Structures are given as structure tokens and as C-alpha cells.
Amino acid sequence: MSKLIVNADDFVLHSAVNAAVIDGHRTGIITSTSLLAGGEAFSEAVSMAKNNPKLGIGVHIALVGGLKPVCNPAEVPSLLTSEGVFPETYIDFMKRIYTGKINYSELRKEIHAQMERIMESGLHVTHIDGHQHMHVLPTVLPIVIEQAKQYSINAIRIPDESSLFVNYMYSPVRLLGKVGLSTVAAKARPTIRDNGMYSTQYFWGMVNGGHINQKNLMGILKSVSKKSGTHELMIHPGLNNTLLGNQYKWGYHWEDELQAVCSNHTHLYIRQHNIELINYGDLI
């Protein structure tokens, strides 16, 4: 049997994302979400999560995306741009790492601050993942595992989507990035396993990240139904493309993603193919 976690990333980012995650959980197939500790709608998201106890909760470690740190910017300057925010893309962050510009005590301090803020909310956390998957970089992963053990969190996302899975991909640049990050993630799998952590056997949503619609969602679900085992699908739902797009220049199609995971066609396919919907807490 295929078991599927549908995780909505970026909970807390904005009220329009929070509302979409809850809508997708109540009326769609979303089973899990991951929180940005430094997002602008934190208190609202925590309250919503507590009112929906079947929704799995993860920590979404942010080190990129032009987002704000949880720490005072003066305490983590090596992680930030001159504007006091994280670099925009994973390429920018990786350049900083491999040119020796990142202070690792600052990196540990910020990751700990993000973890602590979410843990102090009283939510039961099922797993850790990362914005643009920076949590699996070999220089970041040991800190993430250390924090997971400190807070008794037993699962970490491994975003190693198959390099052969293109699924209506429209951007060669995105495809190259996906292959690189998936390779890094695959190398992280033994480390995560050897530290007694769980993850899914398969991951989907990287090549279509921010651009999932009904057509490519069906391509993903067909792949899920053909592979017995545990799967995670990453999505990014939201309620207002214009509002969110003006604030976050990521090019996401938030509304399309929400509509796809809530559609009757999606529900029917999952029932007909006996795909069991779970969250990370069910892996343990």
C-alpha cells in the first residue's frame, strides 16, 4: 500500500497562507504543515494548529527566501544580507557557505532560536524540514540533527525526488537545481537513518514546487500509486496570488495548489487507488 503525507510548507508566512492550509486540511488532502518561526502570522497559525489536532506539525527551518531571522540581526550577521534578511536563494546561501562567509556558531544560534520558538508554543512537532531544503546541506544537517535530538523530534524530510521525474517541467534551470538538491538530499539519507531518525521513502513536489496544478498533481499521484511505501508531497497553498505575489517574489501559484489538493478529482483518485493519507507522526 502507498501511504502519503501531504505537507503544506510556509505555514505562518502570511494569513492568506494560514487560511489556505487549514482549508486544504479540512476539505482537501493536506495532512501536515511546517511552520516558519519568523513568519508574520505566527500567533494566528499556532491557534489554528491547536484547533486542528489531526494536522501534523513540522518546523520549517528558514535560512533563505529574503525572510527575517528569529534572532536579532546583530547576533547573526554572517547569515544575512545588508538589509538584515536571509539571502534570497539557495544558490546565494551555498555561495556563502563554500566561500567561508558563514559563522557556524551564528548558524547554530539561529536554527536553535527557530526551533525554540515553535517548541515553546506548545505544539506537538512531528518533523523538521527546510525552506528551499537547506536543512540537508552537509554543513547544516548536523546542527538540525542535534536540535532534533534535543527536542525529541524523530523525523526529518529527505527531499530526494527522482532525477528521472520531470512531470511537465517547464524550466531547465529548475530541473538542474532539483537534480543538485536531490543528490545532496540522497547523500543525507544514511546520516539521518544512522542517527535514528525517520523519513519517507519517496519525496515529490520539488520539480513542480510552487506550480502544482490539477494536471501535474495527477502525475505525482500516479507515481505514488505505483510505488508501495511511504511518500511525502510538498505543496505551497495560498488564497490570493496577487497579494502573496506582491510580497514574496517567488513566482508561486498558491491558489492553483490549493484548488488541486481540494478537488473532487483528487479525492476520487486517492480513494480509487487506496492511497492512505498520513502525517509524519504515523511513521514512528
Predicted regions and their residues:
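DG-centered beta-turn motif at the end of beta-strands
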Residues: 8-11
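Terminal accessory/targeting
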Residues: 2-5, 15-56, 60-127, 139-284
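Active-site histidine-anchored catalytic micro-motif
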Residues: 130-137
